[in-house]
Amino acid sequence: MGKRLDLSTLTDEEAEHVWAVVQRDFDLRRREEERLQGLKGKIQKESSKRELLSDTAHLNETHCARCLQPYRLLLNSRRQCLECSLFVCKSCSHAHPEEQGWLCDPCHLARVVKIGSLEWYYQHVRARFKRFGSAKVIRSLCGRLQGGGGSEPSLEEGNGDSEQTDEDGDLDTEARDQPLNSKKKKRLLSFRDVDFEEDSDHLVQPCSQTLGLSSVPESAHSLQSLSGEPYSEDTTSLEPEGLEETGARALGCRPSPEVQPCSPLPSGEDAHAELDSPAASCKSAFGTTAMPGTDDVRGKHLPSQYLADVDTSDEDSIQGPRAASQHSKRRARTVPETQILELNKRMSAVEHLLVHLENTVLPPSAQEPTVETHPSADTEEETLRRRLEELTSNISGSSTSSEDETKPDGTFLGGSPKVCTDTGHMETQERNPRSPGNPARPTKSTDEELSEMEDRVAMTASEVQQAESEISDIESRIAALRAAGLTVKPSGKPRRKSGIPIFLPRVTEKLDRIPKTPPADPDDQAKMPKATTAVPSLLRRKYSPSSQGVDSGSFDRKSVYRGSLTQRNPNGRRGTARHIFAKPVMAQQP
């Protein structure tokens, strides 16, 4: 890009946006500079106090070098500073664990100023990036915003940022030395300076109307308040002449400022080097205040005539031919549209950085409350559905068993669509609730379906947790058996089904109808139903009246082993059970 910056093709909204961002940047820099100046004043006071105490070195052995309090053994111990090697008390020192020592308050403040000013960083930026600055942006935008009520920035403000440029810095320093009432010298300076001529070639935008002279005193007073220089009649006489000339030149321009080609933009490195800087250097002084007309400008339609070269136009005989040649050059230039997109991206990045800096520098009461953006209901529903699909796919093995268990209860029959691992099948079932395969199912809202899916997922997760607890219980039993010296070797063959029949409720009802006392006659015993004969002797003994008062502990096993049910005697089983254990669990001799 070089030394040229043309923002004349920006719309009014974009120009206001850029102006507001740059003003926030200046405001934050000024606040940081004021804070650092206060710290510098404290350092100067402490240094003067230290000079007075330097003559009495013996006094520092017994008293603090800062507050002159006497040292005490436990209450107010003596500590030596790492920088100045003076002794200070406990309340006047700061601990530095990384250096394993102490610093007195003046030395600590000096370090804070050195780190907070970032002088080393800005020196590196000035040495590397020399072609862009916030002063150029303000100089390019001040004409448009001045017409809508905004004030023109002072020369000192432009000089604060123009230290990062080569020839632009020389221009700003020379312009600051010149008083505002010497219009002839300013005219000669503007024509002799080549850089300002190149910049002023791009600082004019077509307009639809001529600016009135009523805004001239306001701009002059605002210029006086910002720059601190006296206000004179020569400046007001200079500005109407410039307004008349610019109005005459604007008659042949295009009427609409919104249909304009895009402007050349600064490179990415230069933009971030200047606009992303959080605080100004210690050498640059920002004596400006926030622009008073920026709030009023946003609610109005601003005229788009630039006043950047008003100061350089006070004689029609000299400026007239030059203005015609400049207009012919401006019409011939075309700029790609990609650069305006790059500027928008950079300005958004600068805005994010400025918000972060405002949160750091400004107090919490001055910060505006942030507006939370709530996602739409469709987005929340989509994310919740996606999470439910992930959960159901993770526990697909246990979800099928949970559905089989819930079928006898009748809880989920005829309810919401079945949770499947195939997400596509589930979505088709949800979208077509009245499909031919499921005609009787009532239509339900999305919230009900999601709640049912959540209940089903929770039930499946609880069943998985219960199965895991059972597995851990079995593993603990196996570990206990192994700790007892037993080797458990599971058989590779499938388990043999238990020979003990499982009786349904019908069988228990028939058991209630069985006579209390079994018939002694074998003929009557043969007439009993088959279910009664199928009951083993254990159940018969349980339901018989003779066993009601007998304790269950008096039951006699036929096997010689008396142990727990998990440790069965392999000798009492048939031949297929010998493969389960390699040796008997425990053999007790009778």
Swiss-Prot record:
* Ranges annotated as biased composition (Acidic residues): 154-172
User: Is Chloroplast among this UniProt entry's keywords?
Assistant: no
Write out the coiled-coil annotation as residue ranges.
Answer: 339-485
Q: Where is this region: Disordered?
A: 147-182, 215-276, 311-335, 361-472, 485-590
Q: GO CC annotations?
A: actin cytoskeleton; cortical actin cytoskeleton; melanosome; microtubule organizing center; stress fiber; unconventional myosin complex
Q: Where does this protein chiefly localize?
A: other
Q: Does the keyword Zinc apply?
A: yes
**Which intervals carry biased composition (Low complexity)?**
391-401
For molecular function, the Gene Ontology terms on record are:
actin binding; microtubule plus-end binding; molecular adaptor activity; myosin binding; myosin V binding; small GTPase binding; zinc ion binding
Domain RabBD residues, every copy = 4-124
Annotated Basic and acidic residues bias: 424-433
Compartments it resides in: Melanosome
Keyword terms, alphabetized: Coiled coil, Metal-binding, Repeat, Zinc, Zinc-finger
Q: Which PROSITE patterns match?
A: RABBD
- Top-level taxon: Eukaryota
Compositional bias (Polar residues) = 215-238
Entries under InterPro entries matching the protein: FYVE_2 (IPR041282), Intracell_Transport_Effector (IPR051745), Melanophilin_FYVE-rel_dom (IPR037442), Myrip/Melanophilin (IPR006788), Rab_BD (IPR010911), Znf_FYVE_PHD (IPR011011), Znf_RING/FYVE/PHD (IPR013083)
Q: Where are the zinc fingers (FYVE-type)?
A: 64-107
Name the organs or tissues of expression: Highly expressed in embryos at day 7; not detectable at day 11. Highly expressed in adult stomach; detected at lower levels in kidney, lung, skin and small intestine. Detected in melanocytes.
Gene Ontology biological-process entries: intracellular protein transport; melanocyte differentiation; melanosome localization; pigmentation; protein targeting
**Self-association or partners: how does it assemble?**
Binds RAB27A that has been activated by GTP-binding via its N-terminus. Binds MYO5A via its C-terminal coiled coil domain.
This molecule's function is given as:
Rab effector protein involved in melanosome transport. Serves as link between melanosome-bound RAB27A and the motor protein MYO5A.
Q: What is this protein called?
A: Melanophilin
Organism the protein comes from: Mus musculus (Mouse)
